[in-house]
Amino acid sequence: MIPDVSQALAWLEKHPQALKGIQRGLERETLRVNADGTLATTGHPEALGSALTHKWITTDFAEALLEFITPVDGDIQHMLTFMRDLHRYTARKLGDERMWPLSMPCYIAEGQDIELAQYGTSNTGRFKTLYREGLKNRYGALMQTISGVHYNFSLPMAFWQAKCGVTEGEAAKEKISAGYFRLIRNYYRFGWVIPYLFGASPAICSSFLQGKPTTLPFEKTDCGMYYLPYATSLRLSDLGYTNKSQSNLGITFNDLHEYVAGLKRAIKTPSEEYARIGVEKDGKRLQINSNVLQIENELYAPIRPKRVTRSGESPSDALLRGGIEYIEVRSLDINPFSPIGVDEQQLRFLDLFMVWCVLADAPEMSSDELLCTRTNWNRVILEGRKPGLTLGIGCETAQFPLPKVGKDLFRDLKRVAQTLDSIHGGEEYQKVCDELVACFDNPELTFSARILRSMIDEGIGGTGKAFGEAYRNLLREEPLEILQEEEFIAERDASVRRQQEIEAADTEPFAAWLAKHA
């Protein structure tokens, strides 16, 4: 089932320097909660500056949903330490609040209790909040409080020069983008390995269903927790952050221009379902527009091709201008065993898997085959640890045992690991392979099995409160390592100043401004 990558691996072993200079970035979301686990109702802490303009600390959907962002970094340990500093400083500024250590929220009785993220009075700020109003009215606020980790990854120019002979200019843009699309297609085919190993949301609080019927065969504990005994990541299931209305958009990952055309089509295609919500009611705007996507960021995807945008530029226009610059991996649940929601083992694994995905042959995929890849993902998400579980290839009927496919993949990853270790010294990447491959023979070692044991004993709420309290105490005590307190204060003040400048520069009324942007 695994493509034959022996030639590509042999090439890599002859050109190890092609992997020198991999760049990465990390984003982590987490809910602010009170000591009893309920959602914090306070505004974004003043000590953290402006959520609109702060470089490292912002908010996602809700005012209580923090998002931490590292700068681009070539060193995994340095990047994780930077992320830890963001957590350390924030933990000290949250008073009695703490950061929820799980992907799935708990103790939220009503979606109405969730305040949307606020970004001030500028047109840009109001637009961001209106977009979130649209998300709430389309999908419900509870779904939007699910947290995850995003991993941004780019290969060095030396890789593309060695692999494709690119230099600069239009031809380089096309070849590099084609290489990243190959990575993305392989990710859709084999990325289920990420929730298998690292999925950490095998259960949900009963309030999350809000009385809606479900066909999933949940087991229920006395404390009202619903779980699937072999599930890995309900966050990635249809219960979580997915969007069924997007499944027939026909967006494919074969060609830059095709992909962008599909994205642009989706933001211009009217939706009957969303038209029923209405765009405005009693003078209050309910969504930016009633199209399938309000804006491009609404496209749900487990992985995205990206390029840093210029001021006023849409993500797709940035891609057309310069091609794909990096990849955003979006399938990581919060790691409940780390105070910062992610750890070094995971990131080293993702490095290996990304390199494998770009090396392995990846035939073009129709939108139909893209839908078929969802079958494997759903099996792993809902019953990934089930004995005897099999996976297929695309829309074909042949089935293969998951443990065998996983071990075959890791045989290749071990060779990539040897190459990366030869550049950096040590055996860190090979160690990660040895640790993780054991999860295929013993699923009890996976994150989902480990956290489910705690959840069955303590409930989701009890587990979240215990872990959150322990991490709060730990982070508050640890000294900062990279950033200094003065730098946090300077960025707080600078972010507030930047927001004020944006607000002062706005002269157009929001309604007129929105008419141009909706």
Curated annotation (Swiss-Prot):
Its EC number is 6.3.2.2. It is an enzyme of class 6 (ligase). Pathway: Sulfur metabolism; glutathione biosynthesis; glutathione from L-cysteine and L-glutamate: step 1/2. GO terms for cellular component: cytosol. GO terms for biological process: glutathione biosynthetic process. It comes from the Bacteria. It catalyses: L-cysteine + L-glutamate + ATP = gamma-L-glutamyl-L-cysteine + ADP + phosphate + H(+). The keyword Mitochondrion does not apply. The keyword Nucleotide-binding applies. Keywords: ATP-binding, Glutathione biosynthesis, Ligase, Nucleotide-binding. GO terms for molecular function: ATP binding; glutamate-cysteine ligase activity; metal ion binding. Belongs to the glutamate--cysteine ligase type 1 family. Type 1 subfamily. This is Glutamate--cysteine ligase. It comes from Salmonella paratyphi C (strain RKS4594). The gene is gshA.
